[in-house]
Amino acid sequence: MENMSPKLVEGDEGGFGELEVDVLRAMVLLHGYAWKPDLHDTLSTIWRLKGLDFNQMVEASELIPKVLEKLCQKRILRFERRLRGDLSRSEPLEDTLYCLENERKISEMLSSDPIVLRYRKEIMGYDSLKF
């Protein structure tokens, strides 16, 4: 992880480059940890901010499992199955928790990313941020 370069954040020629970056954006916005449904919700919002239409969002969401697997293989992301609470159920729910291996470094690399800044301003309400 120490040798992580900006190239890993920019994506690669493997076909998932921009989706990998979108996952990293979502993980940074979620402070390095995300339950699977929260990650997918954040990705949908990112894609909406980027102007993707419904069909593009469906195509992208179908590729996300492969993208997550690839990021885990690169040791940028890890996951584990855990129990979490769910207000609609009386029992805990087993779900997947994703974690960035080096959240601080990736956050620094994406600190001036226009999509991250726009999300923080428009969705999270951080009005003091400038583009």
Regions found by a protein language model. Give the residues of each.
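Phospho-regulated, low-complexity intrinsically disordered regions of nuclear gene-regulatory
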Residues: 2-25, 57-65, 69-131
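Short amphipathic alpha-helical elements of helix-turn-helix/winged-helix folds
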Residues: 22-30, 42
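Short capping segments at the starts of secondary-structure elements
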Residues: 28-35, 48
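Secondary-structure transition/capping residues
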Residues: 34, 50-54, 117
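A short acidic, leucine-rich amphipathic alpha-helix
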Residues: 38-40
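Residue-identity detector for threonine
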Residues: 42-45, 96
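Short, positively charged loop/turn segments that connect secondary-structure elements
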Residues: 44-64
